[in-house]
Amino acid sequence: MNRVTPDRPLSRIDGHAHAWTPRKARARFRWGVFGPTAGVAAGHTQANLISLPADWAYDMLLFCQRNPKPCPVLDVTDAGSWTTPLAEGADLRTDLPRYRVWENGELVAEPTDVVAYWRDDLVSFLIGCSFTFEWALSEAGVPMRHIEQGRNVSMYVTSRACRPAGRLHGPMVVSMRPVPPEHLAAAIRESTMLPAVHGSPVHCGDPSGLGIDDLGRPDFGDPVDAEPDDIPVFWACGVTPQAAVMASRPPFAITHAPGQMFLTDARDEQYRVA
């Protein structure tokens, strides 16, 4: 199933969303507010979510270990737990804007909470998200075209296969941000210092090098308009586990909706390396 109308970014709905605390953001999501979280709670770490039955958890942990660029693990829960030390008092079943529910690799629902779908055997993985370093890029003068245009970031399935792990396999997914040439060095420098949220780009320039035919037709998110001289810059993306779910077809999974992330209490500085 696919929704026809994309959700509006929260930064466009509320001009003060960048100043929300993570706790306030999570409370709003719990009340039913939803939309892409780029620019929300600026300076805090955002995370992708994937929850799988316990008998698939080792495969996912190994998949992440073997593919650290798209799948940098921030936390793994005990089976059945919906809490994380990354966000005091948070509930992983209710505190993301929108979720995706999968059965045998097929998308069956996109609810704003998953209490009704939760199972006692689910192990949840929180995986670093590149929205985290967008604040650092912006502070360095790098324009965020998708935020300027009130759109979700563009994400693409690539021709690069991830290293398989047990039953899990699939392609790497990337996010793309158009960057002016004069800001390319800053974009690479600032993102490289945050490896826990994907780090440096995996590719710059010609999208065909990743097997992407048309930047105007992303597989997830929204198309983003580039300025004439902008260079497309691609970062590994935490939607990669969803691509693995589609390819590997586990019996059940819950993920975040692309671009609609879990807001942690952790500051991005906590993951910055020298």
From Swiss-Prot:
InterPro entries: D-Glu_cyclase, Putative_hydro-lyase, UPF0317. Gene3D superfamilies: PSTPO5379-like, PSTPO5379-like domain. Its EC number is 4.2.1.-. It is an enzyme of class 4 (lyase). It comes from the Bacteria. GO terms for molecular function: lyase activity. Disulfide bonds: none annotated. Keywords: Lyase. PANTHER family: D-GLUTAMATE CYCLASE, MITOCHONDRIAL (PTHR32022:SF10). Belongs to the D-glutamate cyclase family. This is Putative hydro-lyase SAV_6940.
